[in-house]
């Protein structure tokens, strides 16, 4: 079987806190996006790659130059435009494939910020969905206890009650002093005055039974995915992943269990973890 890879890479990664977008952060001698591409570029079943990039992306040319020097067969890499939302970028990446992709061809969509996809997980996904009419995605069952955060502010606490000295019955009551405008805004809640960005409270514990964490790649038939995204965008609904677009049109993508090591880079700390995972994989390969 053959498949096409679409990689949305137009994001700027505001949470990452770096001058470069996270997909171009250095990682173990390469960039994050090069690691994300590696399993696909090494797979003979990958017919081509469509990467959605920001119009003013100044970093891709250097990466593309290194990829062009790779030994062996490297599938064609097509540059597509990026969009405001992920769904727009994916749709532009699909459109850039043009007549290369047939209606029933498989398309895999993979995050540019997931550098730790293992070749084994990729092959497992391909084998599991090879004959499926719609497709599915790599995912992992939720293992942690899940908490829903409250949207309500923390209840006010009168911190003066425990420290104030009792007033005798003979002591006259003093008139209240006028409060400044700042004191009026924060009211009588010292915690809000001191901690305007207070941590949220727990509203409830969510039953994790049946809950899975969606990963990528997500694998769907070309025509079905294009149609689902077109209908979602036309309705003003912006799916956070491709599977959600399929859900909205009545499909039920398959959850294919993958490795929790297939992490997404969202902060600088994640780069440390990704480096450790890649090192461990390389060490395991050498010792086999």
Task: Identify the role of each PLM range.
Residues 1-58:
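N-terminal glycine-rich phosphate-binding loop and ensuing alpha1 helix
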Residues 107:
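Short aromatic/hydrophobic "clamp" motif used to bind/position activated sugar donors
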Residues 34-104:
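Conserved N-terminal catalytic core of the sugar/cofactor nucleotidyltransferase
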Residues 117-168, 172-179, 183-254, 288:
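Conserved core of the sugar-phosphate nucleotidyltransferase
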Residues 3, 74-77, 211:
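Short, conserved active-site loop motifs that form the nucleotide-linked donor/cofactor pocket
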Residues 253-257, 263-266:
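Conserved active-site beta-strand element of glycosyltransferases/polysaccharide synthases
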Residues 262-288:
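Hydrophobic helical membrane-anchoring modules
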């Amino acid at each position: 079987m053959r498949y096409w890879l679409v990689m949305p890479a137009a994001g700027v990664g505001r949470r990452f806190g770096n001058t470069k977008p996270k997909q171009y952060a250095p990682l173990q001698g390469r960039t994050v996006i090069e690691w994300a591409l590696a399993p696909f570029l090494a797979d003979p079943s990958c017919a081509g790659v469509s990467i959605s990039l920001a119009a003013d992306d100044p970093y891709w040319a250097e990466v593309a130059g290194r990829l062009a020097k790779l030994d062996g067969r490297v599938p064609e890499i097509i540059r597509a435009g990026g969009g405001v939302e992920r769904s727009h970028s994916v749709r532009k990446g699909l459109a850039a494939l043009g007549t290369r992709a047939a209606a029933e061809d498989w398309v895999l969509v993979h995050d540019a910020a997931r550098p730790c996809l293992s070749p084994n997980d990729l092959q497992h996904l391909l084998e599991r969905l090879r004959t499926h009419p719609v497709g599915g995605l790599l995912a992992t069952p939720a293992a942690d206890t899940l908490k829903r955060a409250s949207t309500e502010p923390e209840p006010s606490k009168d911190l003066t009650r425990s420290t104030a000295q009792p007033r005798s019955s003979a002591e006259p009551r003093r008139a209240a002093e006028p409060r400044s405008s700042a004191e009026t805004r924060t009211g009588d809640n010292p915690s809000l005055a001191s901690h305007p960005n207070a941590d949220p409270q727990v509203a409830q514990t969510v039953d994790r039974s049946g809950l899975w964490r969606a990963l990528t790649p997500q694998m769907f038939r070309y025509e079905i995915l294009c149609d689902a995204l077109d209908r979602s965008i036309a309705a003003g609904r912006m799916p956070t992943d491709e599977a959600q677009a399929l859900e909205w049109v009545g499909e039920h993508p398959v959850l294919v269990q993958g490795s929790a090591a297939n992490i997404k880079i969202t902060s600088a700390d994640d780069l440390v973890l990704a480096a450790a995972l890649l090192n461990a994989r390389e060490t395991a390969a050498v010792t086999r």
